[in-house]
UniProtKB/Swiss-Prot annotation:
PROSITE patterns recorded: RIBOSOMAL_L17
Keywords associated with the record: Ribonucleoprotein, Ribosomal protein
One Gene Ontology MF term: structural constituent of ribosome
Family that this chain belongs to: Belongs to the bacterial ribosomal protein bL17 family.
Cellular component annotations (GO), alphabetically ordered: cytosolic large ribosomal subunit
UniProt record, GO biological process: translation
Subunit structure, as described in the record: Part of the 50S ribosomal subunit. Contacts protein L32.
UniProt xrefs under HAMAP family: Ribosomal_bL17
Disulphide-bridged cysteine pairs: none
Keyword Ribonucleoprotein: yes
Protein name as it appears in the record: Large ribosomal subunit protein bL17
Length: 126
């Protein structure tokens, strides 16, 4: 029986799921806003928020722990240089999920995953 087992499988192997979430977290840290399905967004929050908490204390050991999870030097650099100092006073809840309707092909619920307090880039409206 599957009692007390947390986390979604997404019909993927363990390695595929881990690679998918490390890539999604790297994209989230790079772009500050990504669009994905709602279940993936909810699981992404469980992966990304502990990494941001880890980045509040910049040490070699913490950088190595983050790199072991992400396997992406650029994402680790962004995490410790931008995100850790940005959220130093916030006790958690660094990510916002915004539902944005359903995908046309399969009617899957979609959501935006957004970093809080992200810099807003003004786009020209014509």
């Amino acid at each position: 029986m599957r009692h007390q087992k947390s986390g979604r499988k997404f019909n993927r192997t363990d390695a595929h799921r881990g690679a998918m979430f490390s890539n999604m977290v790297a994209s989230l840290f790079k772009y500050q806003l990504i669009k994905t399905t709602l279940p993936k967004a909810k699981e992404l929050r469980r992966v990304a928020e502990p990494l941001i908490t880890l980045a509040k204390v910049d040490s070699v050991a913490n950088r190595r722990l983050a790199f072991a999870r992400l396997r992406n030097k650029e994402a680790v650099g962004i995490l410790f240089s931008n995100l850790g100092p940005r959220y130093i006073t916030r006790p958690g809840g660094y990510i916002r999920l915004l539902k944005c309707g359903f995908r046309h092909g399969d009617n899957a619920p979609m959501a935006y995953v957004e970093m809080l307090e992200r810099p807003i880039i003004a786009e020209e409206v014509t």
